């Protein structure tokens, strides 16, 4: 089946603007235009339902229901439980909060692995855990290809490693990492995985359950939605980590 590009473009009000007609935008890294369905829903929310949700009056009930619909729908797309989907201001901020939770859960001597193929969002917050007594190890790219080799990961894994953070797709060399293979190796060593899907999600909707990732992060404002970060975290792992909210 051929993709009807004209139909696709018609779903985005931005492209009805004269100054944008006939143009293609490759700026997902910074954000994408929202489709009409998203804009309409946000307009309805701000006009009719911007109240405390789950209350006893109509606007509050309806607003809460729409929030639940968004979570349930997204969970279905991603192949996970509703309770495993969280919303935040951005992937960078979600990762920061997540790192603070791990900082309280990890003990001195525990190790985490980060890569030098990652965007800063999935490496900076984790690297700073070294100030809390956590051993931070770097899974380095092959200098010739820019890719991450699984053999190098194996050399870093041991019983002390509790978390491995890496990108689904590099935003520098565009290499798609073999997430399922990496997850299998890390789980066999007793660790968890945190996958940054920001550069992958706009091009291939991930089935997180199939990938096996314990944590999967991406940004809805880079996938034609509102300015939010999406975090999937497996229920059993979420229950282990100290709560960072109120």
Q: Where are the model-predicted features located?
A:
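Pyridoxal 5′-phosphate
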Residues: 1-246
């Amino acid at each position: 089946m051929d993709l009807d590009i004209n139909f696709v473009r018609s779903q985005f009000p931005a492209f009805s603007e004269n100054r944008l007609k006939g143009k293609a935008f490759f700026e997902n890294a910074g954000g994408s235009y929202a489709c009409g369905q998203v804009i309409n829903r946000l307009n309805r929310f701000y006009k009719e339902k911007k109240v405390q949700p789950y209350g006893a009056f109509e606007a509050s009930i309806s607003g809460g229901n729409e929030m639940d619909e968004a979570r349930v729908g997204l969970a279905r797309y991603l192949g996970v439980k509703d309770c495993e989907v969280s919303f935040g201001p951005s992937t960078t901020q979600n990762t920061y909060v997540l790192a603070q939770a791990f900082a309280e859960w990890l003990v001195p001597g525990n190790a985490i692995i980060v890569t030098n193929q990652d965007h800063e969002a999935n490496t900076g917050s984790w690297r700073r855990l070294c100030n809390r007594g956590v051993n931070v190890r770097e899974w380095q790219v092959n200098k010739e290809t820019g890719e991450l080799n699984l053999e190098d990961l194996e050399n870093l894994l041991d019983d002390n490693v509790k978390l491995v953070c890496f990108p689904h797709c590099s935003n520098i060399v565009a290499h798609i990492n073999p997430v399922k293979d990496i997850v299998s190796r890390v789980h066999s060593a007793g660790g968890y995985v945190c996958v940054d899907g920001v550069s992958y999600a706009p091009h291939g909707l991930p089935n997180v359950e199939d990938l096996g990732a314990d944590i999967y992060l991406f940004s809805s404002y880079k996938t034609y939605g509102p300015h939010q970060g999406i975090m999937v975290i497996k229920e059993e792992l979420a229950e282990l980590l100290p709560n960072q909210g109120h």
